[in-house]
Structure formats: structure tokens, C-alpha cells
Swiss-Prot record:
CDD domains: SerRS_core. The keyword Nucleotide-binding applies. InterPro entries: aa-tRNA-synt_IIb (IPR002314), aa-tRNA-synth_II (IPR006195), aa-tRNA-synth_II/BPL/LPL (IPR045864), Ser-tRNA-ligase_type_1 (IPR002317), Ser-tRNA-synth_1_N (IPR015866), SerRS_1_N_sf (IPR042103), SerRS_core (IPR033729), tRNA-bd_arm (IPR010978). SUPFAM superfamilies: Class II aaRS and biotin synthetases (SSF55681), tRNA-binding arm (SSF46589). It is found in: Cytoplasm. L-serine binds at residues 233-235, 287, 385. It catalyses: tRNA(Ser) + L-serine + ATP = L-seryl-tRNA(Ser) + AMP + diphosphate + H(+); tRNA(Sec) + L-serine + ATP = L-seryl-tRNA(Sec) + AMP + diphosphate + H(+). It comes from Parasynechococcus marenigrum (strain WH8102). GO terms for cellular component: cytoplasm. This is Serine--tRNA ligase. Its main location: cytoplasm. It comes from the Bacteria. Pfam families: Seryl_tRNA_N, tRNA-synt_2b. The gene is serS.
Amino acid sequence: MLDQRLVRENPDAIATELGRRGKAVDLTRLQVIAQQQRKLEEERSGLQAEGNRIGKEVGQKIKGGADPKGEEVAELRQQGNAIKQKVAVLEEEEKHLFTQLKEQLLTYPNLPSPDCPEGKDETDNVELRRWGSPRQEEGLEEHWQIAERLHLFDTERSVRIAQSRFVTLMGQGARLERALINFMLDLHTSKGYREVMPPVLVNSASLTGSGQLPKFADDCFRCSEDDLWLTPTAEVPVTSLHRDEIIPADQLPLRYAAYSPCFRREAGSYGRDTRGLIRLHQFNKVELYWFAHPDHSAEAHAQITADAEAVLQALELPYRVLDLCTADIGFSAQRTYDLEVWLPGAEAYREISSCSVCGDFQARRSAIRTKEGKSTKLVHTLNGSGLAVGRTMAAVLETGQQSDGSVLLPKALVPYVGDERLQPE
């Protein structure tokens, strides 16, 4: 959530910064509410000061010998009581305006970092680096073709069980998925991340705190009889691990590696990636999450990105890193580095991780602060996929496919799978 003080004091500057995202932003309604709130605040403060003055005058008169039940003191007390009633009315009006102001603020995205590349769409993203040599050969299969041939998952029966965009992993496919999850968690925890397995059902406050609500309600699955939603990413529950808390500065950064199933309606993606593991309603992901000191979030962003890259390097999967432009970063992000893995069968780079620094945007929505001495300030939050498991499996299958129909696994996965290859069953 944006800082209401900044919005109130510098609305034009805020509108300009939000406009860098590629869409004009009208802050008129927000300004009107903020001005009304400021006016009420000043009026209330003035009345409270007058009430305090009258209270002191009553005390002085009684101390000077005036009759506590006399007419003069009674008149002053009557004035004081009238002021208290006015203050109570103003406080209620302020609460109402504060609710309106917060509802408005929750609809605005984060301000892009000054270092975020300017751009109008994804074509303006800036490639920073590449790792590995992409495999480029004629006749390579896409991952879903390999999976069907090796019977790694069953989509037809999954439609019967649920609907389209679901898969049931079978045999070697289920084992490979489990191996990837365990490998990712082991790698991250070896680097000091604390493993977390959070609830997959979260309440509205959690989704609001991380930035999914109110804007992305249509892309989430909701339990209609309860205030619960299926989490679209472990970022949501992990953000709320420390909601309404003050974290001592000497405990920062807090670094979590969270595995969870993720659920998304994928509204607006009709017709895209209809086969395989790339775009599903339910998928597994290992999420990296940092609560960092505000002075060190830039270094934390570089590190969380490197930690996500380490998974791809260990699995010998070529990839590239993109610095997303202002029009392509997510709602809660200040700046985002996307990792795109090479899929030899599809002959394309595909997103497998987004590593974002969110500044104090989520922390303000979730009231997560840190204390250093007597000073209390909002923490900074960062998140990144480490990695999306299904897309990682797709890359492993396409990269390791052999002419005999088998799939040669990365050496790092062999101890987890228990075999060097996936063979036709």
C-alpha cells in the first residue's frame, strides 16, 4: 500500500510515478478523501486543544477558591462536555474517511523503482545475462509429448476428476515432481533458509496484505461458505507469518523457503498453453521470501535472484535473466528480475521464476515493522520462485531427452529419483 502521507502531500509526483507503469492514474478521489480527512483532523485537534484549555481553567478556578458546584465552573464544564461530544462525532467521521481512504489506497499498485527500465510492454524488458548453452536440434519433442510417451501424467482422467488445466502425475512423473521439490528445499535450506510449509487456505486479510486483493480476486479460487481462499502462491501466507508484528532489527533478514501447492483460475489465459505443465489451475512451487532491513533490500534482491538461479545451474538448465520494464512488473513489485529457462522442444525461453523487491508496500498493508533502538519502521519484503516445479520438470524433460526415448536426468537429481534416467514403462 502506498504511503497516504506521500499521496496527500505529493499527489502529482505519485501520479507521475504510477504513470510509468503505462496507464494514466487518476488520484482525484483519493485527494478529496485525504483533504477531508486532513480538515477533520485539524478541526478535531483544535477542539481537543480547546477542551484541554477549559479543563485547566476549571482546575485553576477551583484551586483559586471558586465553588466546584458554582455557576461559573458549571458553565465551563458544560462547554467542555459539548466539545467532547463534537470530538466524538469528528472521530467517527474520521474513521469512516480512513476506511474509504484505505479502500482507495489498496487499489493502487506499488511505485516502480527509479532503477526499473522504462517501457510500454514486455518487449521493453532488458536482458541482463545468460547462463549455459541452449540445446538446439531438429526434431526434439516438447515436454508434454515426452510425458505422454513415458506415461508421466494423465490429463484425460484429470479432466474427468476436475476439469481442463489439471494433471495427475503418475509413476515416474510423480517421483520426479517429489524429487524436484525435495532437491529445491534441500538446496535452499543448506544456504540458511528456514523451511516453511504453510496453510494452502488463507483468509482475505492475508491476500490483502500481500497485494492479491482486491485487484486479483477474479484469479483466485474462493471457498464460498468461509472467508478462505486457495492460495495462489506461498508468498501470501508467508507474508502474513509476521503480520501485525515488530521484528527486532538484529533478527533481519528473515529468509524462508516455502513449498506449497498453488491454485489460480488463470482468467484471461484461454487458448494459451493448453497442453502440459506450463499453465495449470493447480501446480507446485517452492517460494523464497525475505523480510529485510530497509537499508539492505537492494543487496537482498540480488541475493534472492542468485539463490533462484542456483537451482537452474545445479540442474544444468540454460536460462536468461530479464530486468522487467515498468509496464511489466507485478502489482506489488518495485523491481523484478525474471528467470526464463530454455525449453529445447518448444524452442523458447519460458518464465520459471520472478524475483521481486517490494519495498515497504506489503509491509504497510500487513503492518510488519522492525525496531532499532527507539525507532520503528516498516520492513522491506522480497519474494522469488525457487522454483516453479512443473515448469522445472518441463525443462528437465526437454533438456534431457535422448534418441532412444529415455530422459537423462541432471546429476544433482539422481540421488533423489534413484535412477539416472526415466525409461519408457
